[in-house]
Amino acid sequence: MLTTFFETKAKELLKNPAQLKGQAEIQAYLQYSTPIPPMPREFKYQEPDTAIAMQVLNAVAPKGAEEFIKEELLGRMGITQYHWEHAISGLPKSAAGSSILSRDMVKFGQLILGRGKWKGEQLIPEAYITRATSPNVHSYGTAYYGFFIWSEDFQVAGKT
């Protein structure tokens, strides 16, 4: 969990962004944050959590995170027109910063509804989709957060 100390330290680190390239960004997150407290913990959606996930993906994907996403997900789904901002680390921003056509956004919905399958090919493990779309953490009202997926019930014409 990030603290006020980290937020203060982050402002100092951002004065020289070159020092946060590559894995240095994640090192700063871990070095200047407090240990995770024991249960119960309060849920807090924050950018560093997604940045850590992007760093891990970048470390394990043979061609790096950006090429992996481009080839193994977007490319297989026929998504070619998109823009993805880059973080200070040089990796794609993970919490925000992507632009995609609405018709391609619908493809992500279809991928999730298809339990990770796209045109018969399993692109994302079904078990991950199940966990990601399950109400793992209550956020507010009827909103829940899974693994990078928000879910919330809405009523339309009296139906949920």
Language model region names:
Residues 1-79, 100-106, 110-111, 116:
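Active-site-adjacent helix/loop patches that line small-molecule binding or acyl-intermediate pockets
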Residues 87-100, 150-157:
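Carbohydrate-binding/catalytic loop surfaces
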Residues 44, 84, 119-121:
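Surface-exposed patches in mature extracellular/periplasmic domains of secreted proteins
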Residues 79-81, 130-160:
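Active-site Gly/Thr loop motif
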Residues 97-101, 121, 139-141:
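Short, conserved, surface-exposed binding loops centered on an aromatic residue
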Residues 94, 101-104, 128, 143-145:
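Residues that flank catalytic or metal-binding motifs in active/ligand-binding sites
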Residues 49, 85-88:
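Short, flexible turn/loop "capping" segments at secondary-structure junctions
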Residues 110, 118-136:
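A conserved catalytic-loop motif detector
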